[in-house]
């Protein structure tokens, strides 16, 4: 009698550089079927099969913590070498050239463009806090299987504008359209909190897992 081999859960390296909700992210990644290794040692990055970059707080402080931990160069090298990378919340914003939150502070520059701040308006509170819809654009593997009624949970004042060179992901409207999730080659990201977004967040993380271990 033949047996079907059990596929091992793909491993991801979750970066703990002092500016992200690592514990919640780790639990969510594990629920989505991944083996999670948490590290505060940048020397682990070159050996990682996949990277997850969380982030919360002020862009300057997050970027300074990232650089102080020695992650800047190794993560750039890994991303440019094609290692799958998932940025979450401010971890998504770090992929770009910089942010209006911290003029003059460079991001990783893996995708061209500047992160912008929501302008205050009578119909819009800043930060955006709560649920909002995801509208799929192009063919992002992160969004596969999600229907037109997909909602995710956001807490943010800064956003990635739709005029950056991205074609695949999800766009959300908060008085201005912005990329709420994206895929570009080996780079993937979500501005919302997958761990707080219920079945939609879990599905997005499971889709990232499938990119690491396709059937």
Curated annotation (Swiss-Prot):
The active site is at residues 89, 193, 195. One of its GO terms (biological process) is L-histidine biosynthetic process. Keywords: Amino-acid biosynthesis, Cytoplasm, Glutamine amidotransferase, Histidine biosynthesis, Hydrolase, Lyase. PROSITE patterns: GATASE_TYPE_1. SUPFAM superfamilies: Class I glutamine amidotransferase-like. Pathway: Amino-acid biosynthesis; L-histidine biosynthesis; L-histidine from 5-phospho-alpha-D-ribose 1-diphosphate: step 5/9. GO terms for cellular component: cytoplasm. Residues 11-215 form the Glutamine amidotransferase type-1 domain. It is found in: Cytoplasm. Pfam families: GATase. It catalyses: 5-[(5-phospho-1-deoxy-D-ribulos-1-ylimino)methylamino]-1-(5-phospho-beta-D-ribosyl)imidazole-4-carboxamide + L-glutamine = D-erythro-1-(imidazol-4-yl)glycerol 3-phosphate + 5-amino-1-(5-phospho-beta-D-ribosyl)imidazole-4-carboxamide + L-glutamate + H(+); L-glutamine + H2O = L-glutamate + NH4(+). IGPS catalyzes the conversion of PRFAR and glutamine to IGP, AICAR and glutamate. The HisH subunit catalyzes the hydrolysis of glutamine to glutamate and ammonia as part of the synthesis of IGP and AICAR. The resulting ammonia molecule is channeled to the active site of HisF. Heterodimer of HisH and HisF. This is Imidazole glycerol phosphate synthase subunit HisH.
